[in-house]
Every structure is written in structure tokens, then in C-alpha cells.
Amino acid sequence: MIQVESKTMTLDEFLDWYPDGYGRFELHDGVVVEMQPTGTHERVAGEFATELGIEIRRLQLPYFIPRQCIIKPIDSDKSGFIPDVAVLDENALDAEPMWKKRSTITKGEIVRLLIEVVSTNWQDDYLTKLAEYEKLGIPEYWIVDYLGLGGRRYIGNPKRPTILVYQLVDGEYVVSLFRENDRIESPTFWISSTNPCP
């Protein structure tokens, strides 16, 4: 992550500022940061998007995976996150006031699943985004820690590649861990192939 702007912004200012077709940026507490994923990070995210897209078609679900969208936390106008993969409910989009103009999601019920692929800034995925997505009521959140970078309290000791599937139960996330050749199971999707992590 690289800080881009020296002044803080609101989400609306950030969306007005966001450069078309250049870079990938998030807003963290008013600070614009450029996300610079590695090739492997992008490959892993792409594998998950492909697998989920196949399942969506096979099951004929009214969902789609946008190329990019911004998730606005429920109680902040100074943050906006771009998940690595988002699965949105096509039928619920009419209820989202910011979608058509800014591809921004403010209501958790529009989202079926979010995936973050862990980078060196793993605390954002395990702490900040986890808490914000839970508050929004997003039913599923997957953390794909393909390098085993997260804290031991999350992925165990010794650290190793892990996929954490958080499911919202009575307003709180409950986690299941998957490793190596485990079949990833979730309430919405079962990825039948082996774990897409390299």
C-alpha cells in the first residue's frame, strides 16, 4: 500500500477524484492508498472469480461478479474498500442508491460474498475489513491467505496457507478454516476443485 494524497478526503471526494482506468485505490480513514497487488495475488483472485463464476452459471443464480466495486462501511464517510472478488445479487441492486453512478455498495444485503486475498498489509483484511463487513451484514467473507501471512491467532502455528470462510450467524461472523487440498465449503458456494491457492 502506498499513500497517494497528502490531504484527507470523504468517500464522495474520493469517488470524484478516482482516476478512470489508472491504478487501484482504497480510502482508509480519509487517506487515499494505492493497492499494488503482485502477479500471484492477482492470479489467485482470478482463480477464485473464475471458480465462483462457473458455480453461478451452473446453479443459475441471479448473481454476478463485477470487475470492481467499492464497499462503503456503514458508519464512515471516510473509507471505501475494493474487495479482490465480490459476488453481488442482481435482483437487489435496485435498492442500492450508489451503484449505477459510482459502482459503490452501501447495503450489505446486495452482497452475497466478498473475498480478500491477503498481502503484506494483512491486518486490513483480518481486522478492519472483517469488522466493517460484519457490521454491514455481508453474509459471507473469505480471507485467502495464500502465503500464510496472517497472525497466528487467525491461521495457527506454524503459519501456513489458509482460507478463512466467515459466515454471518445472528449478526456475528463464525469462521471455518480450509487448507491445502480441502474442499472449500460455504453456505452459498462449494468449490469442488482443490484449493486454488498456488
Task: Please place each PLM-identified region on the residue numbering.
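Gly/Pro/Ser/Thr-rich low-complexity, intrinsically disordered segments predominantly at protein N-termini
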Residues: 1-198
